[in-house]
Amino acid sequence: MKRILCLTLFVVLFGAPAIAATNKAKQSGSTGTGEIGFGVGQSDVNSDTAGIDSAQYIGIRGGYHLNNQWQIEGQLSSSSDSGDISGTSVDTTMRLLMVNGVMNFHPKKKELVPYVMAGIGRADVSVDAAGTSASDNSVAYQIGGGTRVFFGKSKTMAFRADLSLLRDSSFDDSTTLTTVTAGITWKLGGR
């Protein structure tokens, strides 16, 4: 019940500015556009129960620009690695499904777009060791920041790099992942 209340509060607090931003964008004549991309990276895992201390990351993201500054983004990603706990081989995989609110900044250099983001979603964790497997899921929270560097004549493709901190509590243990990612993103629509 506590998680549902927190999720509802999060949606209300971040939903109101997003709706207001959309109405302002409609009045000013700017239209919403999309963005899609992928990234790869490395996660530093802070957990005693996962059996690993780092993991490889791969993910895809898709977003909708409410206006020039605000964006709603969906993220689907997976981190996995193998490690040893007391001589037993352990394979750990974490799959994430997140919804992020992104605030973009637009300095004078138009090809550079730094951003900060915060998100909430679901973490599914599975651990396989010595023929035995266990899985759990939990609510996950994420904050981060990074930049997009647009290139090419039309400036619709960008290199994206970011740093994020993700927290979940699967297997009754709080885990923090610090992830550095790099990837490519494309603008969709007439922005």
What would you call each of these model-derived segments?
Residues 43-45, 123, 166-168:
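A short, flexible beta-alpha/helix-coil linker loop
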Residues 35-37, 101-102, 176-191:
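Outer-membrane beta-barrel "beta-signal"
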Residues 129-182:
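A generic hydrophobic-segment detector
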Residues 5-38, 189-191:
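Outer-membrane beta-barrel biogenesis signature
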Residues 21-25, 42, 56, 63-130, ...:
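Gram-negative (and chloroplast) outer-membrane scaffold detector with strong preference
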Residues 31-61:
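N-terminal targeting signals for Sec/Tat export/insertion, comprising classic cleavable signal peptides
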